[in-house]
A protein has these predicted regions:
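Extended, non-globular alpha-helical segments
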Residues: 35-60, 77, 143-169
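Active-site recognition of the HExxH zinc-binding catalytic motif
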Residues: 78-91, 112
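Long, well-structured alpha-helical subdomains associated
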Residues: 103-104, 117-173
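Short pre-active-site segment immediately N-terminal to the catalytic Zn-binding motif
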Residues: 63-79, 102-107
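Short helix-capping and hinge/turn segments at secondary-structure transitions, especially at repeat
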Residues: 38, 42, 72, 85-94, ...
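Substrate-binding clefts and substrate-entry loops adjacent to catalytic sites
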Residues: 93-101
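C-terminal catalytic core of tyrosine-transesterase DNA break-rejoin enzymes
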Residues: 108-111, 115
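Contiguous, non-catalytic segments that form substrate-binding/exosite surfaces or channel walls
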Residues: 1-71
């Protein structure tokens, strides 16, 4: 094959991504996310995922996030934003009040990834190709998202809350 390493994620979806970062300080961005999770009582657990290509997951029953220690630095930041979005929009308290059409995996993954894209992009993390592919796969090109307006309204609120909280965390460091 004549494929270059940067093409691997397109060819092999489970290969590691090294997203472009045009911001000033990826460590500071990561630290602001960790501070946000701490201030909102969302424990972050880091462990190697031996039999899974997953980058991380949010567990509503424990209101915690687990990240794969095999992630690249930029994957870790992106995944943490994605999982924090789940924690914000899909925790047990919020899920019980949602319409059934909003409480299904395709919608929840769409919302979390859209939030991760919006927040990451705001801070200079370019996940566009990955995010489009991820959303397309989960939603069958949005066919599985019935209420697009309500879904995006929640994404907007979660993106604003997370972005503004991160700014506050950065300013307080």
């Amino acid at each position: 094959t004549h494929a270059k390493p940067e093409d691997y994620p397109d060819i092999f979806p489970n290969k590691k991504n090294q997203f472009d970062f045009g911001g000033k300080d990826l460590d500071l961005l990561n630290q602001s996310l960790l501070e946000y999770s701490n201030s909102t009582n969302i424990p972050i657990i880091k462990e190697p995922f031996r039999d899974s290509a997953a980058k991380g997951y949010y567990m509503p029953s424990t209101h915690s996030i687990t990240l794969n220690t095999k992630n690249t630095e930029t994957e870790n930041v992106h995944t943490l934003i994605h999982e924090l979005a789940h924690a914000e929009m899909h925790n047990n308290n919020k899920l019980k009040d949602k319409e059934l059409s909003m409480n299904v995996p395709p919608v929840m993954e769409y919302q979390a990834e859209m939030t991760a894209y919006v927040v990451g992009n705001y801070y200079g993390l370019d996940t566009e190709k990955h995010s489009l592919r991820y959303i397309s796969n989960w939603t069958n090109n949005l066919e599985k998202v019935e209420d697009k307006i309500s879904s995006l309204s929640e994404v907007k609120k979660a993106s604003e809350k997370l972005s503004l909280s991160m700014v506050d965390e950065i300013l307080n460091m």
